[in-house]
Regions:
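Donor nucleotide-sugar binding/catalytic pocket of nucleotide-sugar-dependent glycosyltransferases
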Residues: 56, 144-187
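Nucleotide-sugar donor phosphate/pyrophosphate-binding loop at the beta->alpha transition
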Residues: 68-75, 116, 126-146
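Aromatic "clamp/platform" in nucleotide-sugar-dependent glycosyltransferases that forms part
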Residues: 268
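N-terminal strand-loop element at the rim of the active site
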Residues: 5-69, 163, 175, 231-233
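Nucleotide-activated donor-binding/catalytic signature segment of Leloir-type glycosyltransferases, i.e.
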Residues: 237-251
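A conserved mid-protein helix/loop that constitutes part of the nucleotide-sugar donor-binding site
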Residues: 16-24, 196, 200-219, 232-235, ...
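Conserved acidic donor-binding segment of nucleotide-sugar-dependent glycosyltransferases
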Residues: 300-301, 305-312, 320-325
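Short hydrophobic beta-strand element within catalytic cores of glycosyltransferases
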Residues: 285-288
Length: 361
C-alpha cells in the first residue's frame, strides 16, 4: 500500500512532528509513505524534523488561498500523483485539503485507480482571528463541499470533531478520532534559578495572543517570564515586553521546559496543542485557555488549570501555582502520567495502520 501525505508547509510545530513520525514508522508495517509539501514563508521557520524526511516539494503550495498559485499547485500535485500512484491521499490542514480534494476525479485519473481520500483536521480555523467573519463562512462552505469527496475525516481531538459536525461538515460515520502520539523530549538538566519561571511557547502571532501573556507578566513582577517562538508579532512583543520578560525568538522546546516551572498558553484557538503535551511529559503543570482540544490535554485542577479566555482567570490560576511548590509538584507529576498514557506514539501509529488497512479492503 502507498500513502501520500500532503501538507502546505512543515512549519515549526506539532503537525510537522506528527507527520514525521508517521513517515518514519509506517514503512516498517509495509505501508510505503511519501510526504509532499510547499515551503514556509515570511517570518516562519521550517521544523527541524523536516530535515529527516525525504519530502517532495510542491513549489506553488502555500498557506494562503491564491487562485493562480493554487492552480499551479494542483497541477504540480497531479505530477506527484502520477509518479507515486498512491492508494491513499492523506491531506493535512485546510490548504492541502483544499488542493487535494477539490477535483478528486482528476486525481483518480492521474493515479490510474480509485484513490481513497483521508483528511486530518489538526484543529480548525473557525475561531482564528485571521479567518473571522466572511473568511470563516467561506472556509465552512469549502469544508462542507470537500467532506463529500472524503472517505475518512480524522480529528486529533474529540472537541475538534464536535465543532465540525456542529457546522454540518461531514457526517458522523466519516469521522475517526486519532490523538497525536508524542514522545518525551530530552530535557537538559535545569540550572538553579532564584525566581519562579513561567514559559510560553508558540507562534508569535494573533491566534496565540502573546500580548495577553505580557499583560499577565506585568501582574507578577517577582516572577520571570520566557516567551519562545517566532512570527509576525515578534517585534511588537519585544517592544512591549515588561522588565521581567525575556523574548527568546525561536527556541528549542526542551530548553524552555528545563528553564521553566510552569507553562502558560494564551491561545484564542487550538487543535490538539502538541507543545502542551510535551510540556506535561516534561512534568510541567500548564495554565491554558479552554480552546479546541486543550481540555483533553490539560485536566483542569489535576495537571494544571484550564480557564476562560481572559487575563484575569489565567492570572488567578497562575498565582495558585506560583504560590505553592507542593501544588506545582503534584500537578507536574500528574501531568507526566496523563500525557504518557493518553498520547502514545504506538497508539497513534496503530490507529493509522488500522485505518489504511480498512480502506484497502
Amino acid at each position: 500500500m502507498r500513502v501520500l501525505h500532503v501538507i502546505a508547509r512543515l512549519n515549526v510545530g506539532g503537525t510537522a512532528r506528527y507527520i514525521m513520525r508517521l513517515a518514519e514508522e509506517l514503512p516498517k508495517h509495509q505501508i510505503e509513505t511519501f510526504v509532499a509539501t510547499g515551503f514556509v514563508q515570511g517570518s516562519e521557520a521550517e521544523d527541524p524534523s523536516a530535515k529527516k524526511l525525504k519530502v517532495i516539494r510542491i513549489p506553488s503550495l502555500g498557506r494562503q488561498i491564491n487562485p493562480i498559485k493554487d492552480h499551479f499547485a494542483f497541477k504540480q500535485l497531479l505530477e506527484v500523483i502520477r509518479e507515486v500512484k498512491p492508494d491513499v491521499l492523506h491531506t493535512h490542514t485546510f490548504k492541502a485539503g483544499y488542493i487535494g480534494r477539490i477535483r478528486t476525479n482528476e486525481i483518480n485519473k492521474s493515479a490510474d485507480k480509485r484513490v481513497k481520500f483521508v483528511h486530518t483536521f489538526h484543529g480548525h480555523l473557525f475561531d482564528d482571528p485571521e479567518f473571522s467573519g466572511l473568511k470563516s463562512l467561506i472556509i465552512t462552505s469549502f469544508e462542507r463541499r470537500f467532506a463529500k469527496n472524503t472517505d475518512v475525516i480524522v480529528t486529533v481531538g474529540a472537541q475538534v470533531g464536535k465543532d465540525l459536525l456542529e457546522r454540518k461538515i461531514g457526517k458522523p460515520k466519516q469521522f475517526t478520532n486519532i490523538p497525536p502520539g508524542v514522545e518525551p523530549l530530552k530535557i537538559p538538566k535545569a540550572t538553579p534559578r532564584k525566581k519562579i519561571t513561567i514559559g510560553w511557547i508558540a507562534r508569535v502571532t494573533g491566534v496565540k495572543n502573546p500580548l495577553r501573556a505580557l499583560e499577565i507578566a506585568k501582574q507578577f513582577p517577582d516572577a520571570q517570564f520566557l516567551i519562545a517562538g517566532g512570527g509576525d508579532m515578534l517585534d511588537q512583543v519585544k517592544a512591549q515586553a515588561p522588565h521581567n520578560t525575556k523574548v527568546l525568538g525561536w527556541t528549542d522546546a526542551a530548553k524552555l521546559f528545563s528553564a521553566s516551572d510552569i507553562i502558560l498558553s494564551t491561545s484564542e484557538n487550538e487543535g490538539m496543542p502538541i507543545a502542551l503535551i510535551e510540556a506535561q511529559l516534561a512534568g510541567k503543570p500548564v495554565v491554558a485557555t479552554n480552546v479546541g482540544g486543550v481540555s483533553e490535554v490539560v485536566l483542569n485542577k489535576k495537571t494544571g488549570f484550564v480557564t476562560r479566555k481572559n487575563t484575569e482567570d489565567l492570572a488567578e490560576a497562575l498565582e495558585k501555582l506560583i504560590n505553592s511548590k507542593t501544588l506545582r509538584t503534584a500537578q507536574g507529576k500528574a501531568a507526566k502520567a496523563h500525557a504518557a498514557k493518553a498520547f502514545s506514539v504506538e497508539k497513534m501509529i496503530q490507529a493509522h495502520i488500522s485505518l489504511y488497512k480498512k480502506l484497502a479492503k
